[in-house]
C-alpha cells in the first residue's frame, strides 16, 4: 500500500541554517480527505487564506511553533505563527474524518485541533506513543525519512511557551514523485569520530531490537566501551558524553516480565554507568554531576556493597573538593563500612577529617574575635 500512498517533504532550517529534509507518507487510503488537505498545503497551489488573503495556503515559510520533548513537535500555523491560526483547503475548519489509526509509535503525523471537528492546517509529529490522543486527533501519515532531524527539533531548547529557542522553519515544501523511494542509507546512523554509530533513542535504531534484551544491552555496552576508551585517553569530556548517552539509552528500556538474571544484568549495567559518570565528572572537576551520579548509583536497585563504596568514595571526594568537609567525612566513613581496608578511601577520610578539624578551628577563632 505504501507504494501508492503520496509522499511530501519539508526542507527545514534551524536557527537560520539548513538542517535537512523530512519526508512524509500520507495514509490516503484510510483518511483521504485529511491526507489531501496536507498534500495540498505542501503543494501550495490552492489559493489564499480567507482570514488573511495575502497569505497563500501553504506550509512554506511557516515554523514549528510548539515542541515538547518526549511528546510532540507541532507546526502548521502559517497565518499567525503562534498556534492560534492556520486554515485548511476546505475552509477555516473541517470535520474529524475518522479515528481508525492510533497514536501507537513515534514519528506519526496527526492533526492538531481545538476540540471535535476543528481541523485546520496545524499538525504534529509524535515523538513517542501517545495513546491518550486516540479518538481525539486524526492520524493521517508518518515520517519515513528525516527521523533524526525530528529528534533534533524535539531536543531543541524551548521557552516557557514551548517555542523553540532557535527558529525551526519550513523553508520549502512540496509533493514528491509517485515512484519516490527512501534511499537505502538515508536513515542509517552515521558513525562519529569515535566509532559510535548508535542513535540516541534505541527505538529509532534499526540495529537494536527492543524486544531482545541482549540486543539492547550490547548496544549500551558498545557506547559505554567507547566512553571507557576515551576516558583512558584522558578525553574526559567525550567520555562523559558517551557514558551519559549509554545511561540514557538504558533509561529508555522498560522490559516486562524479564527473567531475574536479565534484570540483574540491567541493574548492574545501570549502576556501572552511574559510577563511570561520577568518576569522569570528578576527573574533569564537574563536581555537581559527580554528586548527582553517585547519588543515583546509591539509590539504584540491587547496588552491591563494592559499588556503594565506590559511589560514597566519589561523592565524598566531590564534597571534599567543594569545601564541604562535614558531608565528605559522613560519606567516606560510610564507605569504610563497605570497604574497610581500601587505602584510597582511608586516605581520603583522613584528609576530610583534617579539613573538618581545620574548619572547626577557623570557626572557633572567628567566633572568639566576635565576642572579645
From Swiss-Prot:
TPR repeats lie at residues 220-253, 271-304, 309-342. It is found in: Cytoplasm. It catalyses: [protein]-peptidylproline (omega=180) = [protein]-peptidylproline (omega=0). GO terms for cellular component: cytoplasm; intracellular membrane-bounded organelle. It holds the Pfam family Pro_isomerase. InterPro entries: Cyclophilin-like_dom_sf, Cyclophilin-type_PPIase_CS, Cyclophilin-type_PPIase_dom, TPR-like_helical_dom_sf, TPR_rpt. Its main location: cytoplasm. Its EC number is 5.2.1.8. Keywords: Cytoplasm, Isomerase, Repeat, Rotamase, TPR repeat. Residues 9-175 form the PPIase cyclophilin-type domain. GO terms for biological process: protein folding. It comes from the Eukaryota. One of its GO terms (molecular function) is cyclosporin A binding. Belongs to the cyclophilin-type PPIase family. PPIase D subfamily. PPIases accelerate the folding of proteins. It catalyzes the cis-trans isomerization of proline imidic peptide bonds in oligopeptides. PANTHER family: PEPTIDYL-PROLYL CIS-TRANS ISOMERASE, PEPTIDYL-PROLYL CIS-TRANS ISOMERASE D-RELATED. This is Peptidyl-prolyl cis-trans isomerase D. The lineage of its organism: Eukaryota, Fungi, Dikarya, Ascomycota, Saccharomycotina.
Amino acid at each position: 500500500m505504501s507504494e501508492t500512498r503520496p509522499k511530501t517533504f519539508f526542507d527545514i532550517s534551524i536557527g537560520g541554517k539548513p538542517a535537512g529534509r523530512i519526508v512524509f507518507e500520507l495514509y490516503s487510503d484510510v483518511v483521504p480527505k485529511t491526507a489531501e488537505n496536507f498534500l495540498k498545503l505542501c503543494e501550495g497551489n490552492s489559493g489564499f487564506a480567507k482570514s488573511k488573503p495575502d497569505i497563500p495556503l501553504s506550509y512554506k515559510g511557516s515554523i514549528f511553533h510548539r515542541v515538547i520533548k518526549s511528546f510532540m513537535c507541532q507546526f502548521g500555523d502559517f497565518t499567525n505563527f503562534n498556534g492560534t491560526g492556520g486554515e485548511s483547503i476546505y475552509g477555516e475548519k473541517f470535520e474529524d474524518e475518522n479515528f481508525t489509526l492510533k497514536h501507537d509509535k513515534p514519528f506519526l503525523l496527526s492533526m492538531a485541533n481545538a476540540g471535535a471537528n476543528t481541523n485546520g492546517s496545524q499538525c504534529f509529529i509524535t515523538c513517542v506513543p501517545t495513546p491518550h490522543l486516540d479518538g481525539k486527533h486524526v492520524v493521517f501519515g508518518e515520517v519515513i525519512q528525516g527521523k533524526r532531524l525530528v529528534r533534533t527539533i524535539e531536543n531543541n531548547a524551548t521557552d516557557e511557551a514551548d517555542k523553540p529557542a532557535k527558529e525551526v522553519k519550513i523553508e520549502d515544501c512540496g509533493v514528491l514523485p509517485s515512484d519516490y523511494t527512501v534511499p537505502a542509507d538515508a536513515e542509517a546512523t552515521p558513525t562519529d569520530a569515535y566509532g559510535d554509530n548508535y542513535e540516541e533513542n534505541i527505538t529509532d535504531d534499526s540495529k537494536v531490537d527492543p524486544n531482545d534484551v541482549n540486543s539492547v544491552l550490547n548496544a549500551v555496552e558498545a557506547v559505554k566501551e567507547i566512553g571507557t576508551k576515551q576516558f583512558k585517553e584522558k578525553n574526559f569530556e567525550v567520555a562523559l558524553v558517551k557514558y551519559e548517552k549509554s545511561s540514557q539509552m538504558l533509561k529508555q528500556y522498560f522490559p516486562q516480565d524479564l527473567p531475574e538474571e536479565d534484570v540483574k544484568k540491567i541493574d548492574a549495567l545501570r549502576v556501572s554507568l552511574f559510577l563511570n559518570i561520577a568518576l569522569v565528572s570528578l576527573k574533569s572537576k564537574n563536581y555537581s554531576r559527580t554528586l548527582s551520579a553517585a547519588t543515583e548509583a546509591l539509590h539504584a536497585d540491587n547496588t552491591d556493597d563494592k559499588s556503594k563504596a565506590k559511589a560514597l568514595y566519589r561523592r565524598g571526594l566531590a564534597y571534599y573538593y567543594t569545601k564541604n568537609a562535614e558531608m565528605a567525612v559522613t560519606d567516606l566513613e560510610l564507605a569504610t563500612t563497605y570497604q574497610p581496608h581500601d587505602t584510597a578511601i582511608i586516605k581520603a577520610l583522613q584528609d576530610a577529617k583534617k579539613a573538618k578539624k581545620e574548619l572547626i578551628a577557623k570557626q572557633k577563632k572567628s567566633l572568639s574575635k566576635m565576642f572579645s
